[in-house]
Amino acid sequence: LQNYENVLSLQPSEGLLACDAIGIGKIPPNDLIQLALEFIASHKQNEYRKDLLNKEILITGGCTSEKIDAARHITNKSSGAMGLLLSQVARFRGAQVKYVHGPLKIDKNLTDGIKRYEIETSVDLIRALNNEISNCDYFFMNAAVSDFKITSDTSAKIPKNQINAHLNQNFELVPDILKTISKSKKDNQVFVGFCAFTGSIEEARMTIKEKIIQKGCDYLFANPIDLEGQGFGFLAQNEGWLFDTNNMEHYINKTSKIDLANKLITQIISLKK
């Protein structure tokens, strides 16, 4: 069945088998089966095809975490849901997918079948991307990277009355990872960045257009995070605007994150042709 381009097959999972051995042979998790059904249901009858066969896709997602001291760290609200759903949708469409992610705030059953690389800091992320970026056809930079990091590491917990001084003396900006990685982009590769914004798209549009040039990517997807029921989390819905380097923008209306991931990939494939 795997060889049929209009059949979505889920591979057996790894875990404790009936014979008391650990190995591959379990039914995929219910959450993943439900996700696959939602993906299929989002297509019209006989519309589904594995149109990404033989394509390698590299996706980042989730937050990074930068250590302050033994008890504190700098991070953000990203759950890793959008990056994961992009990964599963690309896999459902036939691609070979690698998902590089920070700490996930969603059920890890949903990662079943995805080749994953877990990272923690921005340095970890850059190292992983440098190892993998040259082989991919598409790169989705969906990770929410911490804006700041601490330059001096400490294994102790800093007293509260000293924390302000420590931060003021040791804060530095994290380099723009997408901008850095884009310098090694090949002509046949497609790089997609992501940008969260608040307020109206009219207010954010100029900044977004500047970012796509600064970051050196082919497309930048911008989505609002200050609207009720949208933004962070697996169950949240989303909408957004896909910008390209020709000042064109393509709106994807408010929908579930898996449907959004599917429509976004479809839009990028169609624009690349």
Per-region residue spans from a language model:
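Internal gly/pro-rich beta-alpha loop/helix module
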Residues: 1-44
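Glycine-rich phosphate/diphosphate-binding loop of Rossmann-like nucleotide-binding domains
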Residues: 3-6, 51-121
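Glycine-rich phosphate/adenylate-binding loop
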Residues: 6-15, 45, 186-188, 204-273
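A structural motif corresponding to the C-terminal end of an alpha-helix
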Residues: 6-7, 89-97, 176-189
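Positively charged, low-complexity intrinsically disordered leader regions
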Residues: 26, 41-56, 205
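Gly/Ser/Thr-rich active-site loops/lids in small-molecule metabolic enzymes
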Residues: 75-89, 93, 158-179, 214-219, ...
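Glycine-rich phosphate-binding loop
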Residues: 117-194, 198-229
